[in-house]
Amino acid sequence: MLINWFKLISPKNRILKRATLAAKQVDALKDEMRALSDEQLFNKTEYFINELKNNKTTDDILVEAFAVIREVVYRETGNFAYLVQLIGAYVVHQGDFSEMMTGEGKTLTLVLAAYLNMLEKKGVHIVTVNEYLAERDAEQARRIFARLNLTVGCNKANLAPHLKKEAFDCDLTYTTNSELGFDYLRDNMVRNYRDKKIRGLHFAIVDEGDSILIDEARTPLIISGQPKKDFRMYFDADKFVETLSESDYKIDPESRSPSLTEKGITKAEKHFKINNLFDLENSDLFHKIGNALTARKIFQNGKEYIVRDDKILIVDHFTGRILEGRSYNGGLHQAVQAKERVPIEAENVVVATVTYQSFFRMYKKLAAVSGTALTESEEFLKIYNMVVVPVPTNRPVIRKDHPDFMFGNLKTKWEAVVNEIEKIHKTGQPILVGTGSVEDSETLHQMLLEKNIMHEVLNAKNHAREAHIIAKAGEVGSVTISTNMAGRGTDIKLGKGAKELGGLYVIGTERHESRRIDNQLRGRSGRQGDIGESRFFISFGDPLFKRFAQDRILKAQEKLASDYFDSKFFSRFLTMTQKKVESVNFDMRKNLIDYDHVLANQRELIYKQRDKILIASDLTEVVDRMAQNFVEGFVETFKDQANQTMVNPIELSIAVQKELLQGEEVTASQFYNQTLLAAKQTVLKLVKDAISKKIEVMTVGIANNVFRDIIIQQMDDAWIHHLDQMLKLREGVSLRSLEQTSPLNIYVEESKKLFDLMLNKIAKNVILAVCAIINPTRNVDINVEQEHRRLEALKRLEEIKKLEELQNNNNEPAKVLFKFPDQHGNMIEREVPVDNLIQLVDGQIIQAQVAEEPKQELNQLEKADQLDQTLIEAKLAEQQEQKNNSATDK
């Protein structure tokens, strides 16, 4: 994602000013557009497309295009976009975050912005939080764009692959964030490029952007493979953690991450009978103990998860919804299962993974809309390069937000909440109560039952009735308890007579860690200028105070009576605390992206290379490059121990023959007296020649398909292993925090080494697999003793050649000391004239071994390859005996 440096110095007000000016220019064209016939209006789309083809930009045609689509929407649906919707559409088109209050018409705003970008014919994605919204909005958009010859698709789970491809080939595609992310991962696992579904990541508009880009930013999308089935260690770790006392571990109150103290570490080493918990061989045990600590000391049943039918179901921290089909990764889910004593599911191997942060940053242009984003504006700018621009409401917000009620303890707070509900309920004013957890909603539910107050409960345990419950939440006399679930994808409309009673009354039972979530709850009331009110009930027993309370707050708590009080000091303290928590959470997400950026770059390199392999018409050059890469490291392992610049010819020849050429004859003499560089060139030539011969037999087309299958398989296998190694590195790097280098720097350095190892492994396995198809059925039978004799003969021949040169220089007969057996079989030494030995080598022996090809000229290496030391000695003795009947010693 490219950084727009202008945004770093451009405040939201400046963007809003430009957006307002553009909206007024669009509005000035409404009469002109209204005067056009349907045919004239609809033909404008083709005109815009041609303008863009003629080097115009979308900004050049923005005003007229917005005016056209505004009129088209009016003629098709009867809805005429407000000025604020035009402003919001401008902000979205510019790739920024449009903050629009509930009920301000975000759906139509997205249609306006999408139309302008659809004209580029590169595809626009509108991302929603659930399939219901995606289908609903896609159907509405389809009716509008059909008249303009523009296509609209809806990508859903369980669609057939060809239907998914059709959806993504449309000019506009509605999809959920999770299905879009998984389709991206699946696209990078296909074996045929034509099977890819997403044609490109051009422009995405994220509806409820704060939920997807902030709340779920750290959520990894994971495609799993074959599971790991060793369950014993999960129970062992859980049983150990059960034995710990409070002095054995500590919990960071800000990050909520547990860790063992020195005492706990000692106890663990004694319990598991190991010397050092931090040894690499114990990294898996350390990881499982950490997960067990989180499951036992941090996670609570009814808050982070619920147990249903012996299954662990994750509860969304922000919405209270059950995250269907989700599980904690890295073995944490299994740790929770061990804690709850439910059947442990196998921990899957990660085949492909990406976080929402990394995925959405890959789009060339990214924009978002939501009712609450301003409090996270710094994060959106730094991570997603989006300026949050608050768009004015079409009508003034007249909701009354009352000061918080604060209490000394939980018991008094809940009693006050029930009393407030009872009092307001008697008037008939509709009430929406937001709780922080499923457990709190169940507690309040029981208290209201005791008061005989009729109400509905909306939480993770009955989410199936969500639409029905929300539909009645604005009716007179209704009381609805919700775990923040009403804040996403819902619109509470006031029933008949509710306005006269004061509109929807929102009660918050605790302040959330993020002010944004509090604002979402408040925003359920007062939509489109409706009357309404809100109030929060807070106590020092709330989670926010427990985690971040200061000493003075705790001291004040001891002095306070149980009655509620209104204090500006505590309100300011609460706001400061929320800002502090938001900052901590931002730092955690920023830290995540620092680490994730490393893996994201590696993922991008692998996926791009994978695509090139899939579409290449000739992979010979790719295989040749891999062969060169592999041979470099392969030959290095056969250095001669006595001389590191030379190779060991026997070991290298055997390895080449066994591992690479599958039985093709390779002799040690081919590498005799070769440097590493020369040996690399020799091996590379042997491999390339063998591959070329195979291509000639198979034909280029067939060979290309074979190479593609081999390369893709090896890349996928190596990438899966690499992901596992990176996960272990990420978990283990914190163990080295005592070093002077930062954990992130260590992670960067080590990850590069792992990536290089993976690339080398891919090259090695590809070449070995390619070589295996060259001569797959040949048996390798190497006579090592014979190779030694050949090398010895080669050395002798070199000595002979040197002596021959010496003889030529000195004009004196050169002699060499030679061992041979006498007539009694005893080994003796004799100085033999070089001429005799040269004659012997060039004559009798060579002729005897190449009798069938007497005219063939052999070079010295080929001669040496055929020499047998024993034969030389025997022939030498025979020749001397014929010349001189008695041998004389010197």
Curated annotation (Swiss-Prot):
InterPro entries: Helicase_ATP-bd, Helicase_C-like, P-loop_NTPase, SecA, SecA_CS, SecA_DEAD, SecA_motor_DEAD, SecA_preprotein_X-link_dom. It is found in: Cell membrane; Cytoplasm. Gene3D superfamilies: Helical scaffold and wing domains of SecA (1.10.3060.10), P-loop containing nucleotide triphosphate hydrolases (3.40.50.300), SecA, preprotein cross-linking domain (3.90.1440.10). Its EC number is 7.4.2.8. Pfam families: P-loop_SecA, SecA_DEAD, SecA_PP_bind, SecA_SW. It catalyses: ATP + H2O + cellular proteinSide 1 = ADP + phosphate + cellular proteinSide 2. Keywords: ATP-binding, Cell membrane, Cytoplasm, Membrane, Nucleotide-binding, Protein transport, Translocase, Translocation, Transport. GO terms for cellular component: cell envelope Sec protein transport complex; cytosol; plasma membrane. GO terms for molecular function: ATP binding; protein-exporting ATPase activity. It is an enzyme of class 7 (translocase). Transmembrane segments: none annotated. GO terms for biological process: intracellular protein transmembrane transport; protein import; protein targeting; protein transport by the Sec complex. ATP binds at residues 85, 103-107, 491. It is a peripheral membrane protein. Monomer and homodimer. Part of the essential Sec protein translocation apparatus which comprises SecA, SecYEG and auxiliary proteins SecDF. Other proteins may also be involved. Belongs to the SecA family. Part of the Sec protein translocase complex. Interacts with the SecYEG preprotein conducting channel. Has a central role in coupling the hydrolysis of ATP to the transfer of proteins into and across the cell membrane, serving as an ATP-driven molecular motor driving the stepwise translocation of polypeptide chains across the membrane. This is Protein translocase subunit SecA. It comes from Mycoplasmoides gallisepticum (strain R(low / passage 15 / clone 2)). The lineage of its organism: Bacteria, Bacillati, Mycoplasmatota, Mycoplasmoidales, Mycoplasmoidaceae.
